[in-house]
């Protein structure tokens, strides 16, 4: 047996490692190492006066030299706690204050809310004395606290006790530490205090300060690891364990080598704090070793970021999916709520007009506004400067006479809504015919029930959006979709490119505008459904309550399903008004019409809403029929006002001086027809002082200029129509009220397959109007009544007539020449075949060539016959 002894003598005040013995039979492993070690008992020697010679270390000498002339040598200035070790002892109490593990630790600020943690110095003194004393073992009366040095960052306090004459330092320290433990045991026996003491506010502990503590307030926050530096000889791992184990459980000790510091890893941060404050500055090994201790910041490993960095192809899609899920769960309920408010107008100011508190503010405001308006009206009546309101009439006066003849259509529209049978209604009419006012003002908003749930969508505002972000913002504004983050589109595109470069696949974060709009309309459908079924829960409760009252009655009412409930209560369903719906649009936003038609058809098929579509375009029916192929759509057609209503409207808008020209008005109103926009423009011109004839002539001249600039411009190559086609329509409509589509198709200019699309485009621009019969195009008429006079003005102008008539004949000649060229090619091919076999075909081709040649000759004669004289077209 071999026994190895290691003795460390005089290793500082109160520490002596007596014997370290390891014994083992003479048996070595294959590696030549000792198999096991037995640690014998460690004995601690009492304090010796010789060990205190270097107790103060060199820091105190530096302090004395630097502060030899300084008056204030307190701990806060020097960082050194100086005391007479013969007459005083220093102890460290932990958990007096909440300690901070970082600069942004929330606990240090949260605990300040409680009065127990906002203690003054007197409170701390009293608390320390209570901890140090018990009823069985009270402190001697001559023991008092000489100085109290708080360490708020570490959560503890250094307490300097006066040493009584009847006790030694060892006895006083043992008494205080024992009393503190007994108080902790008594405190933990209280109800619910023990578990809470372990979780939240630990009971303070007491340790003797063995070294020279460095009282510093640097940004070095406590951690479970301590860095131990040695000045002089190093300590072994066993010696470090003996020195630090009393403060708490140690997980690991790294003794280091050379100049590297040793690292001690405690299980709890509380133990590390006590060890650092009590041991730092201690002198061991007869003054040959001085220990300096600092907190070692933990290098925390973030496994999440490590996983993301090492597994990008897996982590990035997961992160994006989580972000998308979080966005859906957070923002979609908010957006749905805003959509519901936009449809129901529940929080609009109009809904609070009967509130008594609001009336206290609104009634004085309304009275002052009436006084101001009456003053304006007085001056307007005196100086004749009455203005038109948004309807074209005088302020305070609406043109109800124009709507008297449409009263039956308003009744029919309301009847269809309350019938609740496939409420997909189409209101047609030319621009300026008052479709919006008929539906919104006279049908819905005047109704106290239907006007409560109304969603208005202007397709023109969506189609005219110049960018994708503008389209999304416009759609969100009309739907009430809030919040919307359009700036994320640009960021998502960059992120998508970056992810594709890193992982080789797209992240799917960026979405097309079509997908985003579908999501917005889908969320709107969900909000509309909630609004429609808002009172369904109350209905079920009322039926169940009635059943309980009528128990045993076989005639009790059955609970209707959601679809049956909405079928029997059409007033519960919101009304969706889609304005300015068209078949197609110029630009990249053309898809919006098809998307809205499919969305509205889904609402009608799901029995969630009434849909009313306002359109002036016949081509829009293609989207609607494809969205609802098996349903008959209800339609209301609006035309211009009658001549009598138009005359009555103009007379009501004119002042007394202008009414003297009533006889001249009748002849001027006939070319204007009943188009509201033209009537309002005519009234404005007469109010400005123009005579009726001059106003009409100027309006016709502007319309003619608009036609020649936009429709008859030869420089425009983007138009689908030709100048000759438009001029032919102008000539025919200037002479007739309407043209038969069958007759028009016989003209060479309209024999091409795209003639119908050209006519639809011209109708969209309000030049002509297409009238269908049983879904088939029947006649073509003028788009605006004013255009009829403009057509006649253009045809009657000799110069304009000669220019466009010659262009028309040249176009016809070009068509015939192209036809002859094809026939000549065919004739050349037939020449190589036996004439007896293709004699009939040769005769047919030759006759066609002769007929086309005769037409060309006739067209050329007409061109030569054109003169600058007045046109004889009429």
Curated annotation (Swiss-Prot):
The keyword Cytoplasm does not apply. It is a single-pass membrane protein. Residues 335-874 are mitochondrial intermembrane. Residues 56-313 are mitochondrial matrix. GO terms for cellular component: mitochondrial inner membrane. Residues 1-55 form a transit peptide. The keyword Aminoacyl-tRNA synthetase does not apply. GO terms for biological process: mitochondrial genome maintenance; mRNA processing. Residues 224-297 form the RRM domain. Residues 547-566 are annotated as: Disordered. It comes from the Eukaryota. It is found in: Mitochondrion inner membrane. Plays a role in maintaining the mitochondrial genome and in controlling the mtDNA escape. Involved in the regulation of mtDNA nucleotide structure and number. May have a dispensable role in early maturation of pre-rRNA. This is Mitochondrial escape protein 2. It comes from Meyerozyma guilliermondii (strain ATCC 6260 / CBS 566 / DSM 6381 / JCM 1539 / NBRC 10279 / NRRL Y-324).
